[in-house]
């Protein structure tokens, strides 16, 4: 770590794969085209991006309390962004705990058989399936994480986000759980004066027009830029100055 890196604030982002996937797939955390790096560059900060495909707000709680990267980044963080909630709201044919156990099925032929079966069932049952995480649990995990971060860094600016939209065939294009998740996150954020970024407002035009990733979920770089602009506005609302604009 360079001395310059040690002196600069860090933007600590907890995210699902929407933060680091582009129009053709996943990208390294230092790719300048993804929104976390656009935001960090505009602030002249370092970026600590902690995330994984499929993460919900429950995973953010686990990461914030168990991942040593989060422990190292928090003391010098200038702000924290919770960029999850989308997976919480997507339909899940199986309970999350069971679905995540598929990767551990042995032998390998049986695991492939189970995965293929789940891939067949998911788009067909998604229109009637429950959300992956009940909305009240989404809000509870956000609050637990906020409380833990605020305990260690009282008053640090925190931003949260509302779920994106999708047209993914793998989910039968179903997203009936979004409204409940939006309501729960909004109520929690209002109670704690947390600025919100509505990812739908930033990316809907690109996604619903078919200009995102072919999977129907992830975004193109125009959408990443639009998200970055809304994140910067939310950070300004939380009291974080835009360094380059001030300069």
From Swiss-Prot:
Q: What family name appears in the similarity comment?
A: Belongs to the OctT acyltransferase family.
Q: Could you tell me the Gene Ontology terms of the biological process aspect for this record?
A: protein tetramerization
Q: What is its EC number?
A: 2.3.1.273
What this protein catalyses is: (2R)-2-O-[alpha-D-glucopyranosyl-(1->6)-alpha-D-glucopyranosyl]-glycerate + octanoyl-CoA = (2R)-2-O-[6-O-octanoyl-alpha-D-glucopyranosyl-(1->6)-alpha-D-glucopyranosyl]-glycerate + CoA
State the NCBIfam families in the record.
DigluglyOctase (NF043016)
Q: What biological function has been recorded for the protein in this entry?
A: Sugar octanoyltransferase likely involved in the biosynthesis of mycobacterial methylglucose lipopolysaccharide (MGLP). Catalyzes the transfer of an octanoyl group from octanoyl-CoA to the C6 OH of the second glucose in diglucosylglycerate (DGG). DGG is the preferred acceptor, but to a lesser extent, GG (glucosylglycerate) can also be used as substrate. DGG and GG are the two earliest intermediates in MGLP biosynthesis.
Q: Name one GO cellular component term.
A: plasma membrane
This one is known as Diglucosylglycerate octanoyltransferase
The family database entries (InterPro entries) matched by this protein are listed as: OctT, SGNH_hydro_sf
Report quaternary structure and partners.
Answer: Homotetramer.
Q: Which gene is this protein's source?
A: octT
A Gene Ontology molecular function term for this protein is: diglucosylglycerate octanoyltransferase activity
């Amino acid at each position: 770590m360079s001395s310059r890196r040690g002196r600069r604030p860090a933007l600590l982002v907890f995210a699902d794969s929407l933060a680091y996937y582009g129009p053709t797939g996943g990208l390294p955390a230092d790719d300048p085209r993804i929104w976390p790096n656009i935001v960090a560059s505009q602030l002249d900060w370092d970026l600590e991006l902690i995330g994984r495909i499929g993460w919900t707000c429950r995973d953010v709680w686990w990461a914030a309390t168990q991942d040593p990267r989060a422990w190292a980044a928090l003391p010098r963080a200038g702000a924290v962004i919770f960029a999850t909630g989308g997976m919480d709201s997507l339909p899940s044919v199986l309970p999350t705990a069971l679905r995540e156990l598929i990767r551990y099925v042995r032998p390998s032929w049986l695991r492939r058989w189970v995965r293929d079966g789940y891939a067949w069932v998911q788009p067909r049952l998604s229109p009637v399936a429950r959300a992956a995480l009940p909305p009240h649990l989404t809000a509870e995990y956000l609050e637990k994480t906020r409380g833990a971060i605020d305990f260690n860094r009282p008053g640090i600016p925190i931003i949260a986000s509302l779920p994106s939209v999708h047209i993914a065939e793998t989910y039968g294009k179903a997203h009936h759980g979004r409204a409940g998740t939006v309501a729960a996150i909004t109520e929690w954020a209002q109670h704690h004066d947390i600025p919100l970024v509505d990812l739908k407002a930033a990316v809907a035009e690109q996604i619903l027009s078919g200009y995102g990733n072919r999977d129907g979920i992830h975004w193109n770089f125009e959408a990443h830029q639009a998200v970055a602009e809304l994140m910067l506005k939310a950070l300004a609302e939380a009291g974080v100055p835009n360094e380059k604009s001030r300069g």
